[in-house]
């Protein structure tokens, strides 16, 4: 079994490609199950956010796994494989695990150290686990990765001033206007990204914020939390006419702000307007950027305007990368030890069989034993067996991660009289349990 990651992100694909390759939240479970039915795919988790679509999979062979991951992607999004392929990246084994650690800790994000991705990775894993597309390897890997990322954000300063892409959006507004005092802001959308934007706007001197959402009750909840106003969705044009800054982040699959309508609106508007589109797919038609005084930024534009990270943060990143290397080695040592689990179980079962034979012999030779005495003897005998096996099992685990591990394990089986049949029975039971 091998760990293989395939995906595209803000490093490899522009937004006009990424927005076509986003898994809808309502279709996540179906996508996971469909992928699991592909040849070579044994486990899978799909991570789909505004900046990345990545599949982490366990495959039986790297070469066939790569092909079937690409085929699934092309079929799911109804695109030619040749059109998608130039934007895809693949990471195998240690490189794949290393990449997942960096992604989850926010080291691969548009905004270094952002925390939102941790929740997104955790959610992706939980959905896959509930759907039944994860197994021994990915369950272990994602638990370790999430735990590590939590420690990173708790014990380092990597996430200072870096909450999410929403943070970058607010920084753009500050760079353009300097002070945001007395600016009128309209937020379109009442989801997580809008909430994060409001958190970043807090303390910026803005007193006039209007939230517009198709479902008005969601806007009202957010407005109450941040002392903002609620605008009617059907009156969006009126609110845009008065706005200085507009942040747009909805789950709409088609643009809700269109070039023709904005051209007419801007002809009536006396001042310029900054529009930051952090939706994916994009919520604002790209042609709006050609309208005079209509300053449009999308997610990719944000990368070029966020200030460079300080030397201190770069130092922390270097330290984290070194720590991640240690975590990756630890994971693969654990994986190697998985290979000796059937041997350990076979050894324990052989010892328990010997105990059972001995207890039966005792019962026949000492018919006067009470039930309590018989049980106590059995407990003590089991304790002796466990103590005697503790050191050999520990040594076996150590052997499994050393050079010539296969030869050492074969010697171990010969010493304890374990046959290939003994081990094969356990391996078959494990395979049936996983399936």
Curated annotation (Swiss-Prot):
UniProt: substrate binding residues: 49-52, 109, 114-116, 120
Active site (UniProt): 50
Annotated site, Important for activity, chain positions: 99
Pathway(s) it belongs to: Porphyrin-containing compound metabolism; protoporphyrin-IX biosynthesis; 5-aminolevulinate from L-glutamyl-tRNA(Glu): step 1/2
Catalytic reaction annotation: (S)-4-amino-5-oxopentanoate + tRNA(Glu) + NADP(+) = L-glutamyl-tRNA(Glu) + NADPH + H(+)
HAMAP family found in the cross-reference section: Glu_tRNA_reductase
Family statement drawn from the similarity comment of this UniProt entry: Belongs to the glutamyl-tRNA reductase family.
Function summary: Catalyzes the NADPH-dependent reduction of glutamyl-tRNA(Glu) to glutamate 1-semialdehyde (GSA).
Name used for this protein in its record: Glutamyl-tRNA reductase
Organism the protein comes from: Listeria innocua serovar 6a (strain ATCC BAA-680 / CLIP 11262)
Gene, per the UniProt record: hemA
């Amino acid at each position: 079994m091998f760990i293989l990651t395939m995906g595209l992100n803000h490093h490899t694909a522009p937004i006009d490609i990424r927005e076509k390759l986003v898994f809808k939240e309502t279709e996540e479970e179906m996508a996971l199950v469909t992928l699991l039915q592909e040849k070579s795919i044994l486990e899978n988790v799909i991570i789909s956010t505004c900046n990345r679509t990545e599949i982490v999979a366990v495959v039986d062979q790297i070469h066939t796994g790569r092909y079937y991951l690409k085929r699934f992607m092309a079929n799911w999004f109804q695109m030619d494989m040749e059109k998608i392929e130039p934007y895809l990246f693949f990471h195998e084994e240690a490189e794949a695990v290393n990449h997942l650690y960096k992604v989850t800790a926010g080291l691969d994000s548009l905004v270094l150290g952002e925390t939102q991705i941790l929740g997104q990775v955790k959610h992706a894993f939980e959905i896959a686990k509930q759907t039944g597309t994860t197994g021994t390897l990915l369950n272990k890997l994602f638990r370790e990765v999430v735990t590590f990322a939590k420690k990173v954000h708790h014990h380092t300063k990597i996430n200072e001033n870096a909450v999410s892409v929403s943070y970058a959006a607010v920084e753009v507004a500050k760079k353009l206007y300097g002070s945001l005092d007395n600016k009128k802001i309209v937020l379109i959308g009442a989801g997580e990204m809008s909430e994060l934007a409001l958190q970043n706007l807090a303390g910026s001197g803005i007193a006039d914020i209007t939230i517009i959402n198709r479902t008005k009750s969601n806007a009202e909840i957010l407005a109450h939390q941040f002392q903002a106003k609620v605008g009617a969705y059907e009156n969006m044009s009126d609110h845009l006419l008065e706005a200085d800054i507009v942040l747009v982040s909805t789950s709409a699959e088609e643009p809700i702000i269109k070039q023709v309508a904005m051209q007419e609106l801007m002809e009536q508007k006396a001042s310029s307007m900054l529009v930051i589109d952090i939706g994916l797919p994009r919520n604002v038609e790209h042609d709006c950027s050609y309208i005079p005084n209509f300053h449009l930024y999308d997610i990719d534009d944000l990368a070029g305007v966020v200030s460079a990270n300080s030397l201190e943060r770069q130092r922390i990143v270097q330290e984290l990368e070194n720590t991640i290397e240690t975590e990756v080695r630890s994971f693969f040592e654990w994986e190697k030890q998985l290979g000796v689990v059937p041997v350990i179980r076979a050894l324990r079962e052989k010892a328990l069989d010997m105990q059972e034979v001995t207890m039966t012999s005792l019962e026949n030779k000492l018919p006067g034993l009470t039930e309590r005495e018989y049980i106590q003897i059995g407990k003590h005998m089991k304790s002796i067996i466990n103590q005697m096996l503790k050191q050999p099992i520990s040594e076996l685990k150590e052997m499994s991660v050393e050079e010539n591990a296969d030869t050492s394990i074969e010697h171990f089986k010969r010493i304890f009289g374990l046959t290939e049949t003994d081990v094969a029975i356990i391996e078959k039971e494990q395979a049936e349990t996983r399936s």
